[in-house]
């Protein structure tokens, strides 16, 4: 049975989608069967894997709102072993449409149960908010990876996220746990980055991954080419660190 991991932080611009795409691709690269679920209305994980959103006829919206069969929505990607459930801007209306729906928080969980046995890992790219889409992701997941940018105010807003995780644990998913905290966008030339690492480690202790994602030009270029870094530039520092992260995640089971 596949392990379901939500990549979430309600703060935007912390490397959430970059991590979802590249962790998923690197897990696939080391031989794991991976499904990436894009549950962010911006659909950046979808386009980051080379899928034209304009060509997507059905997406995760249809699963959440219309109970579409998840098997019909899954698309293969250019990465061997990596499939995706795409998102389009249509998803932006889903939170409002789900409000009157019975069991609205568990719709993604129910859908993924039908395909969980087909994958080693299911990675969910969450939107930068703590609304119903993120609640669906947390309810469906075994664990959470929290990307934290190595910048000033890095920990700002995390107490709200952790409180949401606790509420989901209490009411919807008692088994949900923090998988790990990932430090992203490190500029090793600055003292600030080092200070943030120390602060985050002090707060989260052994939950902080050994792998730290640096700022990397090739990593930021890859999405515009519709490729994860392992395909776009496999020899880059960005590919190297996400491969290290994939191995860390795989070692955790």
Curated annotation (Swiss-Prot):
Traits of the deletion mutant: Not required for sporulation or for chromosome partioning. Cells initiate DNA replication early, 2-fold decrease in sporulation. In a double soj-spo0J deletion DnaA transiently arrests for longer at its chromosomal binding sites, not just at oriC.
Subcellular location, principal: cytoplasm
Catalytic reaction annotation: ATP + H2O = ADP + phosphate + H(+)
GO MF annotation, one: ATP binding
Phenotypic consequence of residue 16 to A: Does not bind ATP, decreases replication initiation, loss of septal location, increased interaction with DnaA. Decreased DnaA oligomerization
List of residues binding Mg(2+): 17
EC number assigned by the record: 3.6.4.-
Keyword Nucleus: no
Compartments, record wording: Cytoplasm
Subunit structure: Dimerizes in the presence of ATP but not ADP; ATP-binding is required for double-stranded (ds)DNA-binding. Interacts with DnaA.
Protein name: Sporulation initiation inhibitor protein Soj
Originating organism: Bacillus subtilis (strain 168)
